[in-house]
Amino acid sequence: MSNLLNKFADKLHGNDHDERYEDDNDDQTRQQRHEKHQQREFRNQGSKADPYGEENQGNFPQRQQPQSNLGGNTQFGGNDFQQQTTDYTAGTGGGTYTQTYRETNTQGQLDDDEDDDFLTSGQQQKQGRTRGAQSNRYQSSNIGSGRRDLSGSGNDEYDDDSGNQGVW
């Protein structure tokens, strides 16, 4: 009965076809109807927590806002050197994202115990770690004078290939 009243109210408001009531049986209990509506409601709005879930395709604009702290990457501005992981938020639909990366310590064991893999590039340059312009080679003046060959072939000045095999 309440269902008929609802339909009537919808018609009064110019809402002839309201999908909330479309396949309702009048002999369903109120609880069953409620659960059915709730399911349909969830299906329509999708799971807000998971914008890339199956049921959500097509419900969201193609270009997502960058998800700022999934995986720790802030995706505006330059590279985020603090969180140096290679994961970035997939599925941003053509949006530009900056891939952050870890500047790996390729010199073998450092003399000091500090973990300077996670320094910003500015801090690394203060420590004498400069990033080569074209090549992925780092020279570190705070490690000693031995020039390491970082290509993995292991030819450095002292013929010591202990710490630099195949890092790249």
Curated annotation (Swiss-Prot):
Ranges for region Disordered: 1-168
UniProt feature, compositional bias: Basic and acidic residues: 8-20, 27-43
Cellular component annotations (GO), alphabetically ordered: cytoplasm
Keywords: Cytoplasm, Stress response
Keyword field contains Cytoplasm: yes
Compositional bias (Polar residues): 56-81, 120-144
Induction data: By osmotic, ionic and heat stress, and by water-deficiency.
Cell compartments where the protein resides: Cytoplasm
Superkingdom of origin: Eukaryota
Note from the entry: 'De respuesta a estres' means stress response in Spanish.
Protein name according to UniProt: Protein GRE1
Native organism: Saccharomyces cerevisiae (strain ATCC 204508 / S288c) (Baker's yeast)
